[in-house]
Amino acid sequence: MESLTLQPIARVDGAINLPGSKSVSNRALLLAALACGKTVLTNLLDSDDVRHMLNALSALGINYTLSADRTRCDITGNGGALRAPGALELFLGNAGTAMRPLAAALCLGQNEIVLTGEPRMKERPIGHLVDSLRQGGANIDYLEQENYPPLRLRGGFTGGDIEVDGSVSSQFLTALLMTAPLAPEDTIIRVKGELVSKPYIDITLNLMKTFGVEIANHHYQQFVVKGGQQYHSPGRYLVEGDASSASYFLAAGAIKGGTVKVTGIGRKSMQGDIRFADVLEKMGATITWGDDFIACTRGELHAIDMDMNHIPDAAMTIATTALFAKGTTTLRNIYNWRVKETDRLFAMATELRKVGAEVEEGHDYIRITPPAKLQHADIGTYNDHRMAMCFSLVALSDTPVTILDPKCTAKTFPDYFEQLARMSTPA
């Protein structure tokens, strides 16, 4: 297996313009494909997840052109539901941001479509979304294991009264919200359970509004969506930088700054993960906000005990930042780490112990006490981009760290390690 050893880093300083947000890129691509008119998307993320979405749209007859660096996409919308040219199988890798929204949107058509992916995708639950789509008339079969992909879709979604479980993934609600305006009937979506990652729903609603569709949101417990609508292209749309990707650089600034400035997001950003900066501030770092930047300056870091439900992806970065904080850090209400690219709670606990931390792993929390001195270890990344990037921070100590399968960062940030090296002064 390929590996990358990062030597100790004495200081991190400088600015980075972030690649586009994965969450925003794939939502914008799907809405542009469903919309009337041509959309020019700029600062699109070039990553595995986005390539899977683009390949699927192409197979569904959507025409687009990409710039040489794949960050600009000119896409001609379908002016309504996506239609398969006959029976079709779409392979979506491990891209949850493609699988969930497409599973819903493709229930508006008539043809038979199979959605599948790599082995980990077949372990990521989708039953709650399928249950909701069936309530709206969709005809869906599980081809292997009940409640998991692969799925066979045969259209039939018309809207109506629908319940969705919000406790596992906000992507299920996102998928229903984006699909419902194109259904023939009005849709009322009721959310049961505590809605996880609520800020991701704000991203969805914000983008839908940009494409000309507004819906009634009653305290995130009920959404009323008029049927028979159309999305309309906004013309040009700039994808904001990925706030989850910003977390590694901001954390590096907190631990070993100088000052690190990330551009492409700021106080006006629609991504909930910008709140990560507030957590670093609570831990002792100094944060400066601009409209399109966030800067972080080193501080004396101390442990925190916090509910992280609102920033589940960026919260992983706090788990490795905790290695540099005084005291025991507890991250709570993070059950949905278990249904991501890997079981992130188990993975994080396992790898933190390798570098010497004392870790308590609960059903939905993790408690981390740093060692007096970090140990050099080979870090397993579980084919999870965030594990690789989180554990790069270990090199901000006086100990090297070896990252196994470093190229897994291609899911959201193909040149992550090059960018980190560019801003780092070796010890």
From Swiss-Prot:
Localization: Cytoplasm
EC number: 2.5.1.19
Active-site residues per Swiss-Prot or TrEMBL entry: D313 (proton acceptor)
Main localization category: cytoplasm
Gene3D superfamilies found in the cross-reference section: Enolpyruvate transferase domain
InterPro entries noted in UniProt: Enolpyruvate_Tfrase_dom, Enolpyruvate_Tfrase_sf, EPSP_synthase, EPSP_synthase_CS, RNA3'P_cycl/enolpyr_Trfase_a/b
Positions with a binding annotation for 3-phosphoshikimate: K22, S23, R27, S169, S170, Q171, S197, D313, N336, K340
Keywords: Amino-acid biosynthesis, Aromatic amino acid biosynthesis, Cytoplasm, Transferase
UniProt superkingdom: Bacteria
GO biological process: amino acid biosynthetic process; aromatic amino acid family biosynthetic process; chorismate biosynthetic process
Catalytic activity of the protein: 3-phosphoshikimate + phosphoenolpyruvate = 5-O-(1-carboxyvinyl)-3-phosphoshikimate + phosphate
Gene Ontology molecular functions: 3-phosphoshikimate 1-carboxyvinyltransferase activity
Positions annotated to bind phosphoenolpyruvate: K22, G96, R124, Q171, R344, R386, K411
Cellular component, GO annotation: cytoplasm
Metabolic or biological pathway: Metabolic intermediate biosynthesis; chorismate biosynthesis; chorismate from D-erythrose 4-phosphate and phosphoenolpyruvate: step 6/7
Homology family: Belongs to the EPSP synthase family.
Function: Catalyzes the transfer of the enolpyruvyl moiety of phosphoenolpyruvate (PEP) to the 5-hydroxyl of shikimate-3-phosphate (S3P) to produce enolpyruvyl shikimate-3-phosphate and inorganic phosphate.
PANTHER family reported for this sequence: AROM/DEHYDROQUINATE SYNTHASE (PTHR21090), PENTAFUNCTIONAL AROM POLYPEPTIDE (PTHR21090:SF5)
Subunit structure: Monomer.
NCBIfam families noted in UniProt: aroA (TIGR01356)
Full protein name: 3-phosphoshikimate 1-carboxyvinyltransferase
